[in-house]
Amino acid sequence: MSVKWEKLEGNEGVLTVEVDAEKVNKGLDAAFKKVVKNITLPGFRKGKVPRVLFEKRFGVEALYQDALDILLPEAYAKAVEEAGIEPVSMPEIDIEQMEKGKSLIFKAKVTVKPEVKLGQYKGLEVEKMDTTVTDEDVENELKRLQEDYAELVVKEDGTVENGDTVVIDFEGFVDGEPFEGGKAENYSLEIGSGTFIPGFEEQLVGMKAGEEKEIQVTFPDEYHAKQLAGKPATFKVKVHEVKAKQLPALDDEFAKDVDEEVETLDELKAKIRARLEEAKKNEAETALRNAVVEKAAANAEMDIPEVMIKNETDRMLREFDQRLQMQGLNLQLYYQFSGQDEASLREQMKEDAEKRVRAALTLEAIAKAENIEVTDEEVNKELEKMAEAYKLSVDKLKELLGSLDGVKEDLKWRKTVDFLVEHSKVAA
């Protein structure tokens, strides 16, 4: 097999590949064995038609596409390896010659990884976040816990105030007609949560249990239900019940309710401080690592192919969909509620996708320049940590992973970022 690589403008190029005639004939043989299984001719059982008769009846050309399906993947993979290129797009294949008894010649136009010209990546000046935990931080966390443990208590004679929870019936009308999804009974709504259309919750303030009222609002222009977007609406509302949050006292009993391992409020505060300190330390470490990568990437020069940004956007979209599914949602529901569509979400993700690609290419170039590699021992240690976290045996984890390439790549990038941090100038 002969291979020729021709670089074109930008990051594109063309592979010209010639597969010898003997290999082509073997591909045709394999194609015939596959195709003949479904062929029936008078005088022959299904799948038993002789090759000569098949070619006389249908022509050898009838085998070409199946032969190409067999030959091309292997030939293309070998050509890529021989040419020493790293394609980032699917190839555009053009068959120049395919004939029995002759070699197969095809061209494959592909986009490859860009060349990266590294700038400064050692001695980068970065600031480390302040990890001090103040008394105010601890008090704010206590208030948050207090809110979490608050009880809703019915206000017998009180009026609706911001922060209260009301139980209501409502029915909405547009142009005098009810609309789908505009009616509910005994619906719990926290005033000030922003759950409803702008202006709805505010108009409930001051009402009492048992009162009825008509509320005038206008649907936002970007509302997910296009038939309602921008239209004025009237809601008939009845308040059944008004509830207010009753915060628990900040005392030792509260501390024991929050954390069974403590006996006093002071002990709870100490645990909160320790937890916040650990969180700030981790946050500072992450910010520092992100900063050195961002600076190194900004100093590097490269021409990123659009297809790499598209591929990364695809990956980000899949990750987002998976996170939504963990919350019982999906992309289609998200589009409905947010008023966005796939095109606008992709556009929103594009800048971050480009940053991710730039960072990955920069780290790859630095790892190559500094001969940063991952040892088998490091891979095994990482597998042991992962297996322990997932409560699996290492063998079972390997079976589930299939390939260890992802683990090796993650470790390599981690080591490369470690290198950048070690060789940076960190200001406190």
Curated annotation (Swiss-Prot):
It catalyses: [protein]-peptidylproline (omega=180) = [protein]-peptidylproline (omega=0). Residues 163-248 form the PPIase FKBP-type domain. It is found in: Cytoplasm. The keyword Cell division applies. Keywords: Cell cycle, Cell division, Chaperone, Cytoplasm, Isomerase, Rotamase. GO terms for cellular component: cytoplasm. GO terms for biological process: 'de novo' cotranslational protein folding; cell division; chaperone-mediated protein folding; protein transport; protein unfolding. InterPro entries: PPIase_dom_sf (IPR046357), PPIase_FKBP_dom (IPR001179), Trig_fac (IPR005215), Trigger_fac_C (IPR008880), Trigger_fac_C_sf (IPR037041), Trigger_fac_ribosome-bd_bac (IPR008881), Trigger_fac_ribosome-bd_sf (IPR036611), Trigger_fact/SurA_dom_sf (IPR027304). Its EC number is 5.2.1.8. GO terms for molecular function: peptidyl-prolyl cis-trans isomerase activity; protein folding chaperone; ribosome binding. Coiled coil: none annotated. Involved in protein export. Acts as a chaperone by maintaining the newly synthesized protein in an open conformation. Functions as a peptidyl-prolyl cis-trans isomerase. HAMAP family: Trigger_factor_Tig. Belongs to the FKBP-type PPIase family. Tig subfamily. Consists of 3 domains; the N-terminus binds the ribosome, the middle domain has PPIase activity, while the C-terminus has intrinsic chaperone activity on its own. This is Trigger factor. It comes from Geobacillus kaustophilus (strain HTA426).
